[in-house]
Amino acid sequence: MQALIFDVDGTLADTESAHLQAFNAAFAEVGLDWYWDAPLYTRLLKVAGGKERLMHYWRMVDPEEARGCKVKETIDAVHAIKTRHYAERVGAGGLPLRPGIARLIDEAGEAGLPLAIATTTTPANLDALLQAPLGADWRRRFAAIGDAGTTAIKKPAPDVYLAVLERLGLEGGDCLAIEDSANGLRAARAAGIPTVVTPTAFSAQDSFEGALLVLPHLGDPGEPMPQHVPGAANRWADLAALRAWHHGTLIEAT
């Protein structure tokens, strides 16, 4: 394992509730009579990308209106307002990283293991989420960052992963990806990257066929995984465990 590549939303932090609240706040601000509840948003998450999700929903509820000439302009405006609301919610550090994430980032830095990000979210959302827990210079901790500002085609297409691999100068099999959703898993696997999946409540019902390992989270000494996982000396993932899993076979833990 020569590099570790993280997805962001749902993987680094359980962000989807904050995104959902931000979407609904944006709808109210612009006067749209839309409201997304958690079950609906769970289904909409099958569509990667916030703007793409908005267009998909618009076509669901009013196909004729969704063909209008100002639809793109409206979606851009709603998404910009949503991004502002999201940044306000997470920017003060109110959204913690998931168990194991901060520790693994530190361990990788100490070991000289390159880290990367492969996400469909925007650079603004990345900054809002990561500045508080990792510091204003958080980007320096990652050898490559692929996001919505660098790669237009969203997951499950592998484009963002392929772009990150090119920047790292590595093959897919040299790396390990950490994802939380079926779309993310499909994208990473299409790029040839072995993948560990840590679902959230919004993705727990996804199919993770082809994942190297499925875990509730990566664990920490103070918040261990519910059970021991083969290849891990403790009930949390450290670099030694990740390397063991990278070279291992299909295991599933719940």
From Swiss-Prot:
Entry protein name: Protein CbbY, chromosomal
Family: Belongs to the HAD-like hydrolase superfamily. CbbY/CbbZ/Gph/YieH family.
MF (Gene Ontology): hydrolase activity
Pfam families linked to this entry: Hydrolase
